[in-house]
Amino acid sequence: MKRRIWASVGMTVMGSVLLVAAMFAGTAAGGTAATDARAGGTLRIVSSSDFDYVDPALSYFSHSWNMMGATQLTLLYYPHKEGPVGRRLSPMAAQGMPRVSNGGKTYTFTIKRGFKFSNGTNVTAANFKRAFDRALNKAMGSPGSSFLDDVARYRTIGTYQFQVTLKKVAPDFLARMSMQFFSAVPTNTPFTAEGIKAPVVSAGPYYLKEWNAKTSALVVRNPHWKNNQQPFRSLGFQNNINEFRWIVGPAPATQRLMCERGEADICSFPPAQAKELADAHGINRQRFFVKSQTVLWYLVMNNSRGIFQNNVNLRKAVSHAIDRRFMVAQHGYLAGQRTDQFLPYSMPGFRNFNIYSLKGPNYAAARRLAQGNTRNGQAVMYTFNVAQGPPIAQSVQFNLKQIGVDVEIRQFDRVVQNEKSGTRGEPFDLTLEGWGMDYPDPSNFINVLLDGRRIQADHNVNVSYFNNAAINRRMDRANSLSGQARLQAYGILDRDIMRDHAPLAPYISTNARIFTSNTVGCYGYTSIQGSLLTQICKR
């Protein structure tokens, strides 16, 4: 999954809502007090796997976007603060919320004066127009293009106004403007399918100075960001840390040791060790944090090829046959709740319909549905090669064997797995995925991950390749609504998709968990941003 695909548990613990890492941090009363803070220092973050891209037009992994939360400047943002204020969409580069005209279809943003890129150039409306240009450029294949498919036109007006006109009213448009795809970029940023490389010029409080693929990354201060001056001061960033260093490659068990020995500051750990860490350090005190997040993990079935294409009964059989209890256990202590629905428990609009078994496999129902529908009985499953990936794949292999399907497991680095499954025509039948919200709206799960009209050649997040015309129309209707009617429509749509079409099999709505060194202070987390890099400090 891209932001938001979630990384595997061992991949990173910094992401929020891009493809998902299942072990993120949480914060609560009892965390390290801000009075323990000191400005400066280096924060070392360990990850089993690398960023997908460092180009905001292409990146969509949770931990990549978490890094970009400290480096990018968007028109609007969700404040880097815990509690209700962190879920309230607010102006960032914009002077205020945009002026709305043309029956709710035209938005005019006025850009604050004073923001500068890390190379010293001024941020203007043209920098946001360039971000739109790149997201919509077909040669780039940006995942951001699908979030602009209802844009009729966009333009700059003078130096500091940016205007967007939609084809139809879209209640979630402003929330989309908080996404990293649409952050300010220099007007000469090239169109390249491979993405730009470090150093990445950006207009947030930090910028990416170095990126050594599969090895390390370095993020340092933007010298032109002045916390105590406007327009910067109103955003409330602390920016305590001088530089962030990412260390890529160590396995989860090694990461834990690195944090315990003071060789790193934010680390993952084997899922089986979560209980031990909680017992040793307590929960939400200083070093081991647990927090609810809007993240879902699920088993994807490829609806475009092989044994699951036009085979809804076999897809339903899989949802009955998998062992959600065992799968959730592989995520470890306090990992989350079992689920059989696509909207996470904490997503507005969620309603519990109890469609499939949350206890163990229902082989009787699964076999009835599978009978006569297994075709050649062969399936290829992709998974990642760390943490919960291998044991969950083996569980699926065993469960599906009981209904007449032989599963061949192929393991990859998480980034490679995602690149493969996101390529249309890739020869897989099953893949293990996780997704976290970009913004708190049910369309960010259902429309983003299941609207088949958004499928492109590569960089897909709809890796089930589900494309149902009737469901697409219902998504459009739900997305045109607002308020309680919108949430009710999406709740029923969730039920009907899972009950009647079963393009994938959800199994856990997760918590965030994170382990830190004893020198980390001011730790904060939100379900939108993930770990708050602009607020964290060293003690």
Question: For the regions a protein language model found, what residue spans apply to each?
Answer:
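Extracytoplasmic/peripheral linker and loop segments enriched in polar/acidic and small residues
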Residues: D36, K316, V328, D406-E419, ...
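Surface-exposed binding/hinge segments that line
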Residues: R38, T110, G144-T189, E194, ...
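N-terminal lobe/hinge region of extracytoplasmic solute-binding protein
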Residues: V46-N102, D133, V201
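Periplasmic-binding protein-like
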Residues: D55, F308-P348, P391-I392, I497-P506
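Gly/Pro-rich hinge or "lid" segments in bacterial periplasmic/extracellular proteins
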Residues: P79-P84, S178-E243
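Structural transition elements
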Residues: Y206-Y207, G336-Q371, V386-P391
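Ligand-site clamp/hinge motif
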Residues: W225-L277, D406
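Long beta-strand-rich cores associated with HINT superfamily self-processing modules
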Residues: I514-R539
